[in-house]
UniProtKB/Swiss-Prot annotation:
UniProt GO BP: cell wall organization; peptidoglycan biosynthetic process; regulation of cell shape
Species per Swiss-Prot/TrEMBL record: Haemophilus influenzae (strain PittEE)
Name this polypeptide is given: Biosynthetic peptidoglycan transglycosylase
Cross-referenced SUPFAM superfamilies: Lysozyme-like
Family as reported in the entry's similarity comment: Belongs to the glycosyltransferase 51 family.
Top-rank taxon: Bacteria
UniProt main location, coarse: membrane
Regions crossing the membrane: 27-47
């Protein structure tokens, strides 16, 4: 009992505002060091899992869903169809080959759109930002997560090539409830490997990326079908 009390006392000190005010610089430096070390390791080896996969698993367990399973199969970029490589860049981040992690033109367009429109908020996250968020952080709209995303993205661009960023993004992106990565998605929805995806199949997978829980590959809504057609048309004009 005394040991438990000591543990709770220590934790209360750790999470107190006074402790954070005194040690926040150390925490930030430790975060940067941990992220940099992680990126150096994963520059060369397959990613076993992402922070977002862990978040989803824990969230489902807390909700009492013990049957929730993660489907995930790592494949190299050479074993991913150029159709979906092209589709995801064309749809999600056309300036991906050029920018250094942040598309400031897209950010300005999103700000102008959000100021004038009441139809919802338009984002401007790049493939690099989404990769950093999915791999190392958590999903949410709080300022802490958004603040950490900036240095994490900068470190990602500093340590990885564009091809590596795209490879990891396609392997850890969510394409359905518990379905992570283009290989698992290809086998689940189309019964084939990711290297054999057609242009239309690639466009359909990319169309659900904004919200793969609401938008369904196997039951595409009118919006998804329209986006698939638009992505398919755009892909034919876009070159990477």
């Amino acid at each position: 009992m005394k040991k438990t009390k000591r543990i709770f006392t220590a934790l209360s000190h750790l999470f107190s505002p006074k402790w954070w005010k005194k040690n926040w610089q150390r925490v930030v430096l430790l975060f940067f060091f941990a992220v940099f070390a992680l990126l150096l390791i994963f520059r060369f080896v397959p990613i076993p899992f992402s922070a977002y996969m862990v978040q989803q698993k824990i969230a489902n367990l807390l909700q009492g869903d013990f049957r929730y399973q993660i489907q995930y199969d790592w494949v190299s970029l050479e074993n991913i169809s150029p159709n979906i490589q092209l589709a995801v860049i064309s749809s999600e981040d056309q300036r991906f080959p050029e920018h250094l992690g942040f598309d400031f033109e897209a950010i300005q367009r999103a700000i102008r759109y959000n100021e004038k429109s009441n139809k919802g908020i338009r984002g401007a996250s790049t493939i690099s930002q989404q990769t950093a968020k999915n791999l190392m952080l958590w999903h949410g709209q709080n300022w802490l997560r958004k603040g950490l995303e900036v240095p994490a993205t900068m470190l990602l661009e500093l340590t990885w090539s564009k091809k590596r960023i795209l490879e990891v993004y396609l392997n850890i992106a969510e394409f359905g409830n518990g379905i992570f990565g283009v290989e698992a998605a290809s086998r689940y929805y189309f019964k084939k490997s990711a290297k054999n995806l057609s242009q239309n199949e690639a466009a359909l997978l990319v169309a659900v990326l904004p919200n793969p829980i609401i938008y369904k590959v196997n039951k595409p809504s009118l919006l998804v079908r329209k986006k698939t057609s638009l992505d398919f048309e755009t892909n034919g004009k876009f070159r990477y």
